[in-house]
Amino acid sequence: MRGVLPPGATIGLHPHETNSEVIYILSGTGQVLCDGVYEPLGPGACHYCPKGHAHSLQNTGPLPLEFFAVVPEEP
């Protein structure tokens, strides 16, 4: 899934109880919060949220944050 967050926008903290998620940053800057740790993200960065964990994504820059997310479903 491709997503775009405007400056200051966030995808709030949410759990991944039955799957994991990989986020790849295409453009812009932001930060992810995972397991209580903030991680800065920019173009080319990748974030992995394992199954059973929670995370959030926030655009901290002046431009849109464009990303690609993969959420594999387990059978």
Which residues make up each language-model segment?
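Short acidic-glycine-tyrosine-enriched beta hairpin
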Residues: 36-51
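A short glycine-rich, His/Asp/Glu-containing loop-to-beta-strand
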Residues: 1-13, 19, 70-75
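Short, surface-exposed secondary-structure edge patches
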Residues: 2, 22, 37-40
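Histidine-centered metal-chelating micro-motifs
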Residues: 10-12, 31, 47, 51-56
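Ligand-binding loop in jelly-roll beta-barrel domains
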Residues: 51-75
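Glycine- and acidic-residue-biased ligand/ion/polar-headgroup-sensing regions
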Residues: 18-30
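A cytosolic small-molecule/anion-sensing beta-strand core signal
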Residues: 1, 26-27, 42-43
